[in-house]
Design a protein with these regions (language model features):
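Non-transmembrane, aqueous-exposed alpha-helical and coiled segments at domain scale
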Residues: 1-144
Length: 144
């Protein structure tokens, strides 16, 4: 799946052309980054590349030797053994790249976005729905 996401999103180094590592969203990493950096808002980019997928996964926890961690394990040995625990979402068929408002987005897309906000304890203020500079949906005035 990582290779597919990388190709869909054109995730290659601008200078070196080296392929970037890609995978499903890990909300534990996002939540931790938001907490330690004092973030109040999130920007979700490249949401459009998920269009057409039947199912979309999101890492919500880790399994370490049968124990569930709802946060990034602080012990490096546990971190190396951690296996992702995923929540799975129904995808959407619609091409969202021309949509201009949150209300236009498919319901399954909105469900996915609401879950990100819920698990990260941080609101989403902007969504990128296409490759062009004007393919953004603003949800809060802060980033306009």
């Amino acid at each position: 799946m990582g290779e597919w996401l990388r190709n869909q999103g054109h995730e290659f180094g601008a200078t070196t052309g080296r392929p970037r590592r890609c995978g499903w969203l890990d909300v534990n990493v996002v939540r931790h980054a938001a907490m330690i950096n004092g973030l109040t808002d999130l920007v979700i980019t490249k949401l459009d590349i998920l269009s057409g997928l039947k199912n979309i996964k999101m890492c919500v926890a880790y399994d370490v030797d049968g124990v569930r961690y709802d946060y990034i394990p602080s012990n490096i040995e546990d971190l190396y053994k951690a296996k992702p625990i995923y929540e799975e979402f129904d995808g959407w068929e619609e091409d969202i790249s021309t949509m201009k408002t949150y209300e236009e987005l498919p319901e399954n897309c909105k469900t996915y976005l609401r879950r990100i906000e819920e698990l990260c304890h941080t609101r989403i203020s902007m969504i990128s729905v296409g490759p062009e500079r004007n393919c953004n949906i603003y949800l809060h005035e802060m980033l306009k």
